[in-house]
């Protein structure tokens, strides 16, 4: 996908459509690293209920994948310009701890990297499982939009509330 060049990534992209072939082993290895990071923060005194797992692009994919399988309740999930990987496994692997955790999803209408249809399909898959999803689209490519930043701020204020 990257012309054969090595670059940092959460997992390998095996095809241009992102989902017909997926690097399950790489996704699961990154999931373990994220779970370990969350455990480290909890051990430092941050309650899991005060953590929002967020990511952009592949980070979005990892935030969705990991949070929905996590046995600790999180404050929220923020999924920006990405998609739900290994969606066909979610029903079997989903943990109920985050079944009602709010998900903020945002995507650019002109995204050439992760086309908006991929994000919409992910949104629809989550909604079909009863996951509360707040969807936003913005006139942008694979990037951030000023209005998106404002919407993110409002979401974080809602799910985190006042500082403890």
Regions found by a protein language model. Give the residues of each.
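A short beta-to-alpha transition loop/helix N-cap that caps and shapes the active-site region
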Residues: 1-2, 84-89, 113
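Serine-hydrolase catalytic machinery in alpha/beta-hydrolase-like enzymes
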Residues: 1-52
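Short aromatic-enriched loop/helix-cap "lid" or pocket-rim segments at secondary-structure transitions
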Residues: 1-5, 91-92, 147-150
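Primarily recognizes the serine-hydrolase "nucleophile elbow" in alpha/beta-hydrolase
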Residues: 47-98
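Short, proline-enriched alpha-helix->beta-strand connector loops that line the catalytic pocket
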Residues: 49, 98-103, 129-132
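A structural signal for isolated positions on well-ordered beta-strands in alpha/beta enzyme cores
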Residues: 52, 78, 102-104, 134-136
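Short beta-strand/loop motif that positions the catalytic acidic residue
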Residues: 104-107, 111
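C-terminal catalytic histidine-bearing segment of alpha/beta-hydrolase fold enzymes
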Residues: 117-164
């Amino acid at each position: 996908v990257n012309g054969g060049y090595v670059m940092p990534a959460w997992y390998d992209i095996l095809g241009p459509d992102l989902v017909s072939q997926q690097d399950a082993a790489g996704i699961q290895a990154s999931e373990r690293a994220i779970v370990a990071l969350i455990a480290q923060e909890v051990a430092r005194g941050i309650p899991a209920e005060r953590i929002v797992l967020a990511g952009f692009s592949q980070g979005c994919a990892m935030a969705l994948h990991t949070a929905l399988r996590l046995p600790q309740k999180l404050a929220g999930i923020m999924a920006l310009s990405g998609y739900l990987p290994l969606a066909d496994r979610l029903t079997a692997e989903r943990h109920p701890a985050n079944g009602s955790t709010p998900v903020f999803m945002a995507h650019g209408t002109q995204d050439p990297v992760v086309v908006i249809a991929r994000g919409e399909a992910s949104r629809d898959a989550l909604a079909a499982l009863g996951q509360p999803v707040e969807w936003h689209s913005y006139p942008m490519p694979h990037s951030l939009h000023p209005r998106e930043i404002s919407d993110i701020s409002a979401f974080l204020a809602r799910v985190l509330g006042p500082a403890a």
